[in-house]
Swiss-Prot record:
Function recorded in the entry: Antibacterial activity against Gram-positive bacterium S.aureus. Shows no detectable hemolytic activity towards human erythrocytes.
Primary location: secreted
Keyword set includes Disulfide bond: yes
Keyword line: Amphibian defense peptide, Antibiotic, Antimicrobial, Disulfide bond, Fungicide, Secreted
Protein name, per record: Ranatuerin-2SPb
SS bonds (residue pairs): C28-C33
Length: 35
């Protein structure tokens, strides 16, 4: 139903956000980030 689709969309957004943050911190560890 509608509720399940909404939950799926939110989960997708959250996953994308978390993955992005993980990638950023990984890049920082590898290349050494400068603020």
């Amino acid at each position: 139903g509608l509720f399940l689709n909404t939950v799926k969309d939110v989960a997708k957004d959250v996953a994308k956000d978390v993955a992005g943050k993980l990638l950023e911190s990984l890049k920082c560890k590898i290349t050494g980030c400068k603020p």
